Amino acid sequence: MLKVKIVRLNKQASLPVYATAHAAGMDISACIEAPITIQPSTTALIPSGFALELPEGYEAQLRPRSGLALRSMISLPNTPATIDADYRGEVKVILINYGKEPFLVSHGDRIAQMVVAKVEAVRFEEVEELGSTVRGEGGFGHTGTGRQ
């Protein structure tokens, strides 16, 4: 199991936790002094109260929680949000309210999930042309949307 250093920046902060034994993502909770209301079609930056030291070659991805998206139309506009291995600041979550009603975030609310993933650095090799494939340049629904 990968060990990641974490600092609680606020004594009231909840550290990330897996909700089930086989969950891919850890729940991230809001660490705020007063409730924050996110009006429809607006965003809010929500602090978590902790900072990470990810090992080189890893990133943390912040993703929406499916229940918030389904029930309240709350998501992350930049999903997945990336936390780089060399970032040492507080983890904060940008939430957006796609719904029609204001949404209240309170201290301790689980607002996102975090997945730690290995990343590979790449070096590009510029060439005159790319190898061919059956797919070619087809994209953006070129295979259709109905049953096959």
Curated annotation (Swiss-Prot):
SUPFAM superfamilies to which the protein is assigned, alphabetical: dUTPase-like
UniProt keyword Metal-binding, yes or no: yes
Associated pathway: Pyrimidine metabolism; dUMP biosynthesis; dUMP from dCTP (dUTP route): step 2/2
Enzyme category, top tier: hydrolase
Stretches assigned to coiled coil: none
Binding residues annotated for substrate, in chain numbering: R65, S66, G67, N78, T82, I83, D84, K92
Top-level division of the source organism's lineage: Bacteria
Keyword Ribonucleoprotein found: no
Listed GO biological process terms: dUMP biosynthetic process; dUTP catabolic process
Free-text function comment from the UniProt entry: This enzyme is involved in nucleotide metabolism: it produces dUMP, the immediate precursor of thymidine nucleotides and it decreases the intracellular concentration of dUTP so that uracil cannot be incorporated into DNA.
Annotated protein name in UniProt: Deoxyuridine 5'-triphosphate nucleotidohydrolase
